[in-house]
């Protein structure tokens, strides 16, 4: 089992992590371009430093025009209709109970009794699921994979699965799309785009972006050849379902066929067919909501975490699930191995990393998840004291988020801020991992940013062919991309897998660069290469029964 006592000391104060070479993290006084030996392997990504000052938070403001008109007392039935659309049944009962002389006394009394009963039922339900008493903004902040979601200027970050393009959701609920091959930065805004909690690019598609919002899901379709920096709201498709708000998690199937959505206040997972704007709810037998969804890279399983001390794994053929209860709290974060046969996760309140294996079944057990009965501990993140050039420092605590690079050889863990550790700043731990023949988890180093900058979000580039590329969003508004140069032990030239590996089609398949949907990038700028002497396999489309 790996422990923090095996980690090398953190970089000296004032130093920033630049890249990894020869299994060691290289630091410098400031962010700079890679050394000449590595510049041929670098991606020309934009340098971003988005400050918080020009951004406002419209999600917390009233966008209505009600304040622009002189107050007029409407009839009670009109007020009830307005309240029904804004609040629901509880608001209608409250409006009638507090009306003056517009309704019969017995109607007001009945509504008052109904309000009291609703209050008792809500109190009982809230005692079972305390998170349901939180506001929408607080719900999102509680379960977001970014630290300090409420006030950070960079709320969500999402790489495109196939190109050097990423989207960033900002504090003002706008979304900017950056492309390494273009200087045009589209800014996406929509009247329903409030409290953005998640972004998800559609696989095998050039420019379809799903956005999880306060009251709906927006599907933006962007023209890669357009020169416009403000796409029309007509480019956005609206998906909504009663009771499914706020939407906090989205997950596309690796073949792009289905979109899953989840909300902490809704006990069901919705499986969307975006083309027809229809959805099918996955059966759920316990309330409490779903906080996070994560599809395995092979498309066979889906991790669904909940606000309670249990998480579920669904299999994507017959859509059955298995549940794993935890002892101390809910599942905080998780990530899949590239082959989908191992799940790493952490539990709220514990400084441990668990591993859950899913042995691959060869033609048997279809319709069953088939995971191990219990998880094993693979890393202990408990606080410990390490020696540094500046003296002794404490390191460790709970993990906030965790990401595994697509090659399966680097694992990054974003720790929660602790006043007794690193002056309360979140720390990024980097591990070396290996899945075969046995699972190994070894310490690599500690990633450090500029003085005063706190790491808030981490993610890996999905198709960096020289090792791994870790993107970090900092509290200062800076987005840094840290290359981790290594030779993939399994594939010397990394080739991403869009599902289970398959034999090339009869007659030979074309290179993935020749797929028409990736016209926005030139072949020379593609971030991966096929294996030498081998054409890329066609993506696998798992057949699902809903």
Curated annotation (Swiss-Prot):
InterPro entries: Aladin, WD40/YVTN_repeat-like_dom_sf, WD40_repeat_dom_sf, WD40_rpt. Residues 500-546 are annotated as: Disordered. It holds the Pfam family Beta-prop_Aladin. WD repeats lie at residues 149-188, 191-230, 243-282, 285-324. Disulfide bonds: none annotated. One of its GO terms (cellular component) is nucleoplasm. Residues 534-546 have a biased composition (Low complexity). SUPFAM superfamilies: WD40 repeat-like. Signal peptide: none annotated. Keywords: Acetylation, Cytoplasm, Cytoskeleton, mRNA transport, Nuclear pore complex, Nucleus, Phosphoprotein, Protein transport, Repeat, Translocation, Transport, WD repeat. PANTHER family: ALADIN, ALADIN/ADRACALIN/AAAS. Plays a role in the normal development of the peripheral and central nervous system. Required for the correct localization of aurora kinase AURKA and the microtubule minus end-binding protein NUMA1 as well as a subset of AURKA targets which ensures proper spindle formation and timely chromosome alignment. Interacts with NDC1, the interaction is required for nuclear pore localization. Interacts with the inactive form aurora kinase AURKA. Interacts with PGRMC2. This is Aladin. It comes from Mus musculus.
